[in-house]
Amino acid sequence: MMQESGTETKSNGSAIQNGSGGSNHLLECGGLREGRSNGETPAVDIGAADLAHAQQQQQQALQVARQLLLQQQQQQQVSGLKSPKRNDKQPALQVPVSVAMMTPQVITPQQMQQILQQQVLSPQQLQVLLQQQQALMLQQQQLQEFYKKQQEQLQLQLLQQQHAGKQPKEQQQVATQQLAFQQQLLQMQQLQQQHLLSLQRQGLLTIQPGQPALPLQPLAQGMIPTELQQLWKEVTSAHTAEETTGNNHSSLDLTTTCVSSSAPSKTSLIMNPHASTNGQLSVHTPKRESLSHEEHPHSHPLYGHGVCKWPGCEAVCEDFQSFLKHLNSEHALDDRSTAQCRVQMQVVQQLELQLAKDKERLQAMMTHLHVKSTEPKAAPQPLNLVSSVTLSKSASEASPQSLPHTPTTPTAPLTPVTQGPSVITTTSMHTVGPIRRRYSDKYNVPISSADIAQNQEFYKNAEVRPPFTYASLIRQAILESPEKQLTLNEIYNWFTRMFAYFRRNAATWKNAVRHNLSLHKCFVRVENVKGAVWTVDEVEFQKRRPQKISGNPSLIKNMQSSHAYCTPLNAALQASMAENSIPLYTTASMGNPTLGNLASAIREELNGAMEHTNSNESDSSPGRSPMQAVHPVHVKEEPLDPEEAEGPLSLVTTANHSPDFDHDRDYEDEPVNEDME
């Protein structure tokens, strides 16, 4: 492409020389005509001999113009045949010099014939027209020289870039972006010059006999070469300033910023084409602040376009330093920030869940259509669940120990211990999020109205599943009512009014509400004049315990033998939480004031489970088989229902399921009859 443009430049240069010869011939014709008409007044009545002489001159001018066009076409064909193959190594970094810009803008034969046939131009006007044509050609030559210099600079920069192979990739990317910017800038200048030339040509062709001669308008109605050089210096200086700061910006978009900053000047020039004085354009180029260092902020996810991107903040920050001050002062580690962080976790999990559902739907569609999958199926990662006793082979086959670990529900990893119970370790803040439901429900930490009040607008507008159990939400709805009692329809209305998730999704959640009302002992149905209303038994609600453990004495002995490990488990929980500084379950979020209280609640629940086990030794079912009785206790991952897949998995200590009703289970989205009340 580089050699093609070079050949094109040579052909255009010869065309310019031919054009100058043609214009000299036109000058001679104009001089002859002016000499002929000097002795007489410029009247309209012309003799027959003069008319024949003018027609002969017109035919000669047309022949010269045709010869010029034929020579141009032949030279372009020869240059196209002789041009070598394109260099594929540098396809995008060449500046295309358009043929319309490099060819001399002479008057076409049709325009010349129209001017001569009209016989409306006086000799003075024809002389002025030819002078303007010469000025245009001179400025075209200057522009051609400038474009040649720019082409040489590009070639030198390309050679330097090829030889400097040891440069880091980021500097090479910035250099290529600068070359692309220069290319776009030159293309923009060429288009601008073409537009102004077309405007001038239209102005030359619409001269009336009574009008004075047109003023001499220079070609450089856009940026003259000196201003273009100044703009290029600004770009290179901005590039050096970016390199000295040492910021790792691999995507420095000079093209968009520079072109957008020069766009207003281009628009103003086209709208005001006559704003030039003495051949120099008096354009006030806007200050290109987008190239300065201040307009390239540090890459921070919470900062963009001078605005803080913290959810619900949108505070205006002048620069990055003021943003950091604002972030440390307004969004420090407090209850409000942790609640907002927890809500953001819910948003992310909801989006991940939606993505997983769409992927499963796509996979099912492709399987149905017998199309091979485009992405490999991820191998399921089994959870490492280690109990205090060695699991038998039959028990390990029956227990759900190889549950797939989906990426949409990040669970807390369990590190195996050789002897003793498994120790739960939290590696990051995000691993604590999935067990938030069991913290609020299993450990007697009730839902706080302050949490819903703080995030009320978010829950009303965003389609995010609230991070609470159905039982907690039903209790909250009843407690918020003036009479502390609600009918079933009023509970439905509270759900849809407070949460957009329940408004916009299918009404399967109503089944879960009816399940929880009917099967939880803490909800009491009262008959009155209105009909059936539901109330909350707070004492029964506070008695909610983890899943009951029952079995034969051998099972109880296993549990008692593992009771000695409760203290190390609590210590490990406290150490891991303190080590990772988990701020997500504070007063505003879960109603628990400190992490110490949370750990103590866990300890109390574990101790309560032990006491409950000792008190229920006689609850073992006599109809159970010995094989069921010898199954040791293991920690299992409790899967949720399909409709509640967005909820996290939780860790519960389970043995053989008790025949008693599980009062703590959150009955959600199970198919029931609609008439069940």
UniProtKB/Swiss-Prot annotation:
Residues 404-418 have a biased composition (Low complexity). Residues 286-298 have a biased composition (Basic and acidic residues). CDD domains: FH_FOXP2. Residues 348-369 are annotated as: Leucine-zipper. It comes from the Eukaryota. The modification Phosphothreonine is found at T653. There is a cross-link at K287, K372, K377, K442 (Glycyl lysine isopeptide (Lys-Gly) (interchain with G-Cter in SUMO2)). Induction: By androgen in an isoform-specific manner; expression of isoform 4 is greatly induced. Residues 667-677 have a biased composition (Acidic residues). Residues 1-43, 270-298, 390-422, 611-677 are annotated as: Disordered. The keyword Zinc applies. Forms homodimers and heterodimers with FOXP2 and FOXP4. Dimerization is required for DNA-binding. Self-associates. Interacts with CTBP1. Interacts with NCOR2 and AR. Interacts with FOXP2. Interacts with TBR1. Interacts with AURKA; this interaction facilitates the phosphorylation of FOXP1, which suppresses the expression of FBXL7. Interacts with ZMYM2. Transcriptional repressor. Can act with CTBP1 to synergistically repress transcription but CTPBP1 is not essential. Plays an important role in the specification and differentiation of lung epithelium. Acts cooperatively with FOXP4 to regulate lung secretory epithelial cell fate and regeneration by restricting the goblet cell lineage program; the function may involve regulation of AGR2. Essential transcriptional regulator of B-cell development. Involved in regulation of cardiac muscle cell proliferation. Involved in the columnar organization of spinal motor neurons. This is Forkhead box protein P1.
